Amino acid sequence: MQNTSGLQMTTLNDILDMRNRAKYATDTGTKMHKKLQHVVIDNGIEQGDATLISQIKNNPEILRFFNRAAKTEVPLAGVVSGKFVSRRIDRLCIDDKHKHIDIIDYKTDVNRDAFYALYVAQVREYVMLLGMIYPEYKIDAYILWTHDFSLEKIGLK
C-alpha cells in the first residue's frame, strides 16, 4: 500500500501475513527434515515415508545417499574463520575405504535465489569443519531441493 506521498506502507496485516508465511515455511521444512531423516533404501529394505521413498527411488543420483550407512542430523562444531560455529548436517555419507565424504543439506524453498548465498556458505562451513576432522578425505557437498527432489552439487571454491 502507498500513502499520499508515494511511500510504501506496510500494514499490520502485511506483517502478519509475512510472519505466517515464514512460520509455514519453517514448519514445512522441519516436517520434511524429520521425514527424510528416517528414510532408508538399501538392499531391499525400505523404511520411512512411502511417498518420499518413491520420489527418491525415481532419482538414482539421490538414491545412493539413503543407504543404511548414512548418518542423519549429525552435530558438528568447530572454528571457521576465527569464529566458533555449531551446525547439524542433514545427511552424511562417509566412505572410509575410498576416503570420500558426501554432505547433503535439505532445502525446502521453492525460490532458490532467496537465501542461496547463505545456503552455500552454510554447506561450505560443513566442508571446512569436516576437512579438519578428515584431512585426507575428498569431500563433496550437495543441496537436495525437496520441492522437486533435484540435487545440486555445491562448488567448494
Describe each model-derived feature in a short phrase:
Residues 1-89, 95, 119-121:
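Nuclease catalytic cores
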Residues 83-157:
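Mg2+/Mn2+-dependent nuclease catalytic core
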